[in-house]
Amino acid sequence: MSAPADATTALKGKFPQVTDRPSGDLPAVNVPVADVIAVLKHLRAEGYDMLVDLTAIDWAEGASPRFTVVYHVLATAKGAYFRVATNCLNDAAPAVPSAVQIWPGANWHERECYDMFGIQFEGHPDLRRILMWDGYPYFPLRKEFPLAGIETVLPDVEIAAETKTKVIAAPMAGGPFVASSGEMNLTEAEPRAKDESWNERKEKPE
C-alpha cells in the first residue's frame, strides 16, 4: 500500500519548497538539500518510522547536479511508502546531511552510499567504507567506473589482529571458489568459497 493520496499535498503545504517528483510507483517529492533533514524529521513525526532504503543516482560526468540521494521510507502502521530525493549541490565533493539522528538504521545505508558513490553524509557518527577496504581508491557505482572493474592491489591486512577475533575470516578477495555441477539442488550447486562449502547437512571439509 502506498501513502495516502493527500500525503504529498500535505507535505508541500508545510514545505512550499518541496516539488513533485515523477514516479510510476510511490508518492515522491524533490527536496532542496538545505531542507531535507527538516522534511525527513516531519515524515518521521507523521509515522514514517522505518527507513527502508537509501541510495543514490549518478547522472554522469557533465551533469549538474550530478548526484541525487534517494530515501524510501515506510509508515509501518499504515503500510504507506514515500520517496524523497535531494540533489547534492557540490558535484566534485557531493555531500548531504546524515539521517542517522532520525533513523538509526540509516547508519549502514549511508556508509554503503559513501563507499559506492563517494557521497559524504555530514554528521554521520562513523562514516567509513562498508564493502570495500579502507584506502580503496575508487567508487564502484559511479558512472565512470568500468563494468569490468579496475585491477587493484589488495592490502595485506592481518584480519585477526584488526578484528580482534579468533575466527578465521573468509579471504578478502573471495575464493578459491568451487561448484558441484552434478548437484540437482541449486543451493548445493552454487559456487562458494572453498573453506565455506559446508552446512548443517554436510560436514566441513578438512
Where are these regions (language model features)?
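Terminal low-complexity/charged segments
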Residues: M1-E206
